[in-house]
Amino acid sequence: MEFKVNSECSEKQSSDCIVIGIFESGEFSPSAEKVNKISHGYLKGLPQNADLQGKAEQALLLHHVPHVAAERVLLIGCGKEEELDERRYKKLIKKMVNTLKETGAKNVFCYLPELKVKGKDIDWKIRSAIEVIQDALYCFDHYKSTKTLHALNQITFIVTATQTKAAQTAIQEGIALAVGINEAKNLANTPPNICNPAYLNASARKWAEKFKNVRVSVVNEDEMKKLGMNAYLAVGQGSKNESLMSIIEYKSGKIPAGTKPIVLVGKGMTFDSGGISIKPSQNMDEMKYDMCGAATVFGVMNVVAELNLPLYVIGVLAGAENMPGGNAYRPGDILTTLSGQTVEVLNTDAEGRLVLCDALTYVERFDPELVIDIATLTGACVVALGHHMSGLMSNHAPLAEDLLHASEQSGDLAWRLPLGEEYQEQLDSNFADMANIGGRTAGAITAGCFLSRFTHQYHWAHLDIAGTAWRTGKEKGATGRPVALLSQFLLNKALAQKQGA
């Protein structure tokens, strides 16, 4: 898919389709007024039937509108102008794409970024449009004998002359973001008989070959044993697939000497059966998505490298597979973590935090500016927040505020949960420093509390993406969240870096 910007009058340029908005009660957007004028009142002369009421997400496809060079004109209902917010704007873009897919149109001129969206500029509108368009066109058909093909291959956004420069930058950022999201989706959707910890590492290495300022290394099981990463090792010992922690290091040549890295740690359970505490069989196939934290990190690193952001970012893909077997770890086991703290295993299905606790201790060696871990960690977070927002916890209020701000900017929403000392008591164990679960109540919070015990050396945030990383049902598949949130967070960091230079 190719994206362009143009500030010229597209109504007189040849194309397969132009897309314009109309508001409820027959109010026209500026572009609709233009088309109506060029066509000598053709749009105003259409019957005000149910197809042309301008209600949100209505669509009316017109062919051969008089004096308009495009073969088709697609009218998108925008609802009431004063109610047009970011959520509705994205829905309008999605409606546009889904309608265009059925038309056979190849090259399209789109006027929808002219719409006034509360609190959003042209940069946001074009970036968001690209993200929605690529999501609507995305199809994971790698393992299907018949591939899904769409004719649509070029969209030109029509903007004013003064908006052109910002729009071109937005296209560059939007494409990079869409690529990062799609790479995260592709990795997450890959079946678990193919996507194991070694596959995560191979994918990172192959991708890194495109960039001179990216390098990839790996911590294998032998090195983990030498280091004392016994919690991480325990989780994967029931699987024939070796646990591997892949480390992606991106370092811009534009940063000052002594810059500390931002570290992203992604839970990469390439399949989570639950181990000895085995999961119910229903929907167990979706446990291939337990590596969406690692997929997110991979996607974000794509965005950072594609945009050549002036940052130092390290991404950790904490890969392992949790399987039952004669060598699997058991409820009742006590593990000595890399930090020296001991953990009593009460449930082997609370394995992600065991992998992460050692990974979080490991990254201390990088002397990070901050660390963010991303994990499909708890079903409790899904119960608390549903599938709309990721759970956010942090030991540093400014970091949490920056992430929440980025979530609002991107529309990839998060909600902060508490990390109070009163919750820590639920992790008490009679036999070890802590247990790996904290009982039925506040499960997402106690999981965050567990991780917090391994993050005293740096500013840290935790994103629980169990409810947002993939969809179930008819639209089953990875969402690519929260690549957009974290990419926006890093774009903000890069902007601050430039302004401070």
UniProtKB/Swiss-Prot annotation:
It catalyses: Release of an N-terminal amino acid, Xaa-|-Yaa-, in which Xaa is preferably Leu, but may be other amino acids including Pro although not Arg or Lys, and Yaa may be Pro. Amino acid amides and methyl esters are also readily hydrolyzed, but rates on arylamides are exceedingly low; Release of an N-terminal amino acid, preferentially leucine, but not glutamic or aspartic acids. GO terms for biological process: proteolysis. It is an enzyme of class 3 (hydrolase). Mn(2+) 1 binds at D272, D349, E351. Its EC number is 3.4.11.1, 3.4.11.10. The keyword Lipoprotein does not apply. Pfam families: Peptidase_M17, Peptidase_M17_N. Its cofactor is Mn(2+). GO terms for cellular component: cytoplasm. GO terms for molecular function: manganese ion binding; metalloaminopeptidase activity. The keyword DNA-binding does not apply. The active site is at K279, R353. Keywords: Aminopeptidase, Cytoplasm, Hydrolase, Manganese, Metal-binding, Protease. Mn(2+) 2 binds at K267, D272, D290, E351. Binds 2 manganese ions per subunit. Its main location: cytoplasm. PANTHER family: CYTOSOL AMINOPEPTIDASE (PTHR11963:SF23), LEUCINE AMINOPEPTIDASE-RELATED (PTHR11963). Belongs to the peptidase M17 family. This is Probable cytosol aminopeptidase. It comes from Hamiltonella defensa subsp. Acyrthosiphon pisum (strain 5AT).
